[in-house]
């Protein structure tokens, strides 16, 4: 496809996301329309309209490409960007804080345009043969991004040249930039017993002998993009002039940027580094502040304490082992530290995939589930076909490998995993789910009630730790990340190809009832299962409203029909057109 066609395809994906967010957040089309039509009344005279290609019980709808604008008696096809702009203006006009939203509108449209153009560039990579092991390919082939985000691929700060060098969708790898930092100006923390291991692996990654580093200096890896940000920081410059930072330059093994962009993977050493980059990706500048790195290691300490007890051959937790960050002021000074330098230098080391090797069939779920707006097929469709199982049997196996251990972990320990589709990996054997891996502990939390009962609080982490939440909030977060984001995406992806999504939700409900009987002596587990089975609605992030209100850090939630509960009541219909 030519560049113009790629941009058109990217814009098609963008309007699909905007429509799905709008309908979810406005509680529209919660049952399939009999005439397969959708419409948005913009004003007394103007209406946007089009046709569903596929209706999804979880809201992952697909659409025919034509979007019509009806203005009085005239009807014409409008562009995707024009349709998006009109939907956003319509939402802004009905917002409580209309003036603030209108002032923010230009930036929102700029971010959407940025996301569309970035997506078009990444789709170009999708047409090129890419020779790597399947796991690396999976991490680097999430071309469209979050299905319920208005700007899933926006990246403000990266130039076009930076994209080519550092964006995972461009199928790249690169060496890191290393600093030797005096211990007096470096903040460090490690999971108990992991400091020596972190030290060893970082020297291996840098291909630097410890004898080359002066006494009392510690190795600090940085992203090659970020080193230029640090060099402009006054405190960094002062440290360099004082000889407290020695620039070692680019060195060592190449690493692969993963789907999160800032986290990189060393295939040679099977280790992840979560590195700060001062780039706004979707809603946030992707740096690591003090609370984030502290809660990450608190969470890792909890996981380390229960890992042997809760892991099975088919369920693994990948935890962070430690962090290193530049201090804004030398130790001993009483000046309140200015956290910007720490935030822009704090890096976290995460353990790799257990028993990893390049021949294994491991995928990050997000790219496995991704469908293009003009096709119901996905990599997941290919996997299920390869397995030889019926989709229902494949899903049942998947639930046993993922949802069941996640619910058991929560009910037995209070650990609420942020197991969304970019944090979860699945290892397949002949296309059949075999091992589930959950990573990135920054977002996990603990139910104060359960964790206190199990003595994780205060024996492992203090009750005041940012990782400790009220029980209801911990359960709320698990339901969103695991059921709405993860399971909802999975079931709808299978449903797009098989046209039986509601039947699949019936299977999920049946599995929950089976587990309820099997684990009837676990009161918390039974309560969780009954909540999923009986509660008519479930909370989902309202990313479009949050974007309009500029509150991504504290997102708005909306309540949507719970397809597990409604699976027997919701009728299913689809367009005969494909």
Swiss-Prot record:
EC numbers on record: 6.3.2.54
Pathway: Siderophore biosynthesis
Catalytic reactions on record: (S)-2,3-diaminopropanoate + citrate + ATP = 2-[(L-alanin-3-ylcarbamoyl)methyl]-2-hydroxybutanedioate + AMP + diphosphate
Keywords: ATP-binding, Ligase, Nucleotide-binding
GO biological process, one term: siderophore biosynthetic process
Enzyme class: ligase
Keyword Thylakoid listed: no
Coiled coil: none
Effect of loss of the gene: Mutant shows a growth defect in iron-deficient medium and is significantly attenuated in a murine kidney abscess model of infection.
Induction: Up-regulated under iron-deficient growth conditions. Repressed by Fur under iron-rich growth conditions.
GO molecular function list: acid-amino acid ligase activity; ATP binding
Family: Belongs to the IucA/IucC family.
Assembly and binders: Forms a mixture of monomer and dimer in solution.
Descriptive protein name: L-2,3-diaminopropanoate--citrate ligase
């Amino acid at each position: 496809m030519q560049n113009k066609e790629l941009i058109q395809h990217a814009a098609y994906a963008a309007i699909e996301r905007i429509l799905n967010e709008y309908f979810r957040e406005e509680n529209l089309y919660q049952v399939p329309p009999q005439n397969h039509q959708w419409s948005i009344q913009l004003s007394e005279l103007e209406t946007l309209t089009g046709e569903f290609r596929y209706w999804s019980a979880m809201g992952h709808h697909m659409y025919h490409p034509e979007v019509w604008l009806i203005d009085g008696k005239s009807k014409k096809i409008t562009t995707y960007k024009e349709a998006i702009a009109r939907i956003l203006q319509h939402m802004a006009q009905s917002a409580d804080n209309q003036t603030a939203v209108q002032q923010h509108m230009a930036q929102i449209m700029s971010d959407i345009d940025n996301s569309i153009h970035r997506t078009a560039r990444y789709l170009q990579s999708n047409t090129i043969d890419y020779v790597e092991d399947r796991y690396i390919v999976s991490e680097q082939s999430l071309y469209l991004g979050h299905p319920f985000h208005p700007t899933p691929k926006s990246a403000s700060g990266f130039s076009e040249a930076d994209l080519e060098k550092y964006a995972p969708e461009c199928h790249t790898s690169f060496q890191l930039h290393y600093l030797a930092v005096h211990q007096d100006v470096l903040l460090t923390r490690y999971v108990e017993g992991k400091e020596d291991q972190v030290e060893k692996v970082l020297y291996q990654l840098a291909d630097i002998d410890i004898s080359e580093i002066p006494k009392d200096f510690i190795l600090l890896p940085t992203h090659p993009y970020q080193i230029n940000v640090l060099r402009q920081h006054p405190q960094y410059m002062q440290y360099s002039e004082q000889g407290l930072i020695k620039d070692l330059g680019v060195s060592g093994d190449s690493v692969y940027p993963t789907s999160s962009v800032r986290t990189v993977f060393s295939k040679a050493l099977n280790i992840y580094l979560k590195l700060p980059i001062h780039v706004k990706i979707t809603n946030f500048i992707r740096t690591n502040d003090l609370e984030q790195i502290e809660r990450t290691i608190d969470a890792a300490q909890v996981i380390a304490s229960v890992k042997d007890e809760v892991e099975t051959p088919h369920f693994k937790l990948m935890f962070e082992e430690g962090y290193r960050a530049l201090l804004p002021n030398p130790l001993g000074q009483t000046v309140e530290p200015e956290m910007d330098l720490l935030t822009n230098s704090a890096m976290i080391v995460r353990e790799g995939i257990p028993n990893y090797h390049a021949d294994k069939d491991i995928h990050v779920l997000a790219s496995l589930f991704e469908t293009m707006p003009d096709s119901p097929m996905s990599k997941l469709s290919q996997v299920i076909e390869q397995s030889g199982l019926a989709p229902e049997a494949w899903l049942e196996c998947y639930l046993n490998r993922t949802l069941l251990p996640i619910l058991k972990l929560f009910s037995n320990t209070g650990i609420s995993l942020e197991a969304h589709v970019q944090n979860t990996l699945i290892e397949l054997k002949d296309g059949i789910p075999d091992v589930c891996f959950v990573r990135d502990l920054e977002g996990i939390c603990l139910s104060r009630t359960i964790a206190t009962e199990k003595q994780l609080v205060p024996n492992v982490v203090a009750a005041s730790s940012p990782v400790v939440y009220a029980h209801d909030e911990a359960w709320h977060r698990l339901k969103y990340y695991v059921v709405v984001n993860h399971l909802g995406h999975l079931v709808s992806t299978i449903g797009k190809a098989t046209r039986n999504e509601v039947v699949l939700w019936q299977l999920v409900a049946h599995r929950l009832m089976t587990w309820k009987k099997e684990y009837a002596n676990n009161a918390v587990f039974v309560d969780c299962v009954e909540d999923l089975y009986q509660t008519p609605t479930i909370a989902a992030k309202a990313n479009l409203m949050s974007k309009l209100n500029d509150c991504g850090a504290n997102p708005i939630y909306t309540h949507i029909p719970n397809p597990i509960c409604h699976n027997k009541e919701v009728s299913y219909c689809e367009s005969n057109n494909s």
